[in-house]
A protein has these predicted regions:
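Short, cationic-aromatic polyanion-contact patches
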Residues: 85-102
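Positively charged, polyanion-binding regions of nucleic-acid-associated proteins
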Residues: 16-42
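Short acidic, hydrophobic short linear motifs in intrinsically disordered regions
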Residues: 39-53
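Short, positively charged loop/turn segments that connect secondary-structure elements
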Residues: 53-68, 80-90
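Long, low-complexity, charged/polar intrinsically disordered regions in eukaryotic proteins
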Residues: 1-22
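Basic amphipathic alpha-helical segments that dock to polyanions
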Residues: 71-75
Length: 102
């Protein structure tokens, strides 16, 4: 019996510039709304990962996800306020940055 490669295969989606800009605009809007709804006003990368999962960005597309997240939080909209613990299963307990609206 042949030994099969059991690694998970992903259908990697590539984004055009317009798709990327649209997704970024929607993610920043989502994060802004979420920050306004919370009494602490804090949003994290976990919140961005939740949005990207709902948008269909595969969990295996690490570079794509990080690119979206870094772009969203590096803009003028958010200020880094400290660190908190991640609640995502993939990063359980790791320290991640917390952001508030600028």
């Amino acid at each position: 019996m042949a030994n099969r490669n059991r690694s998970t295969r992903y259908n990697l989606k590539s984004y055009s510039n317009s798709e990327r800009q649209t997704t970024m605009r929607r993610m920043v809007s989502y994060l802004r709304t979420l920050a306004n709804r919370r009494s602490s006003g804090v949003v994290t990368a976990d919140d961005a990962h939740t949005f990207l999962t709902r948008e269909g960005v595969n969990i295996g597309q690490v570079r794509t996800r990080l690119s979206f997240i870094n772009s969203a939080f590096s803009g003028e909209m958010f200020e880094r306020t400290g660190t908190t613990r991640s609640t995502r299963p993939q990063a359980k307990g790791r320290a991640i940055s917390a952001y508030t609206l600028a």
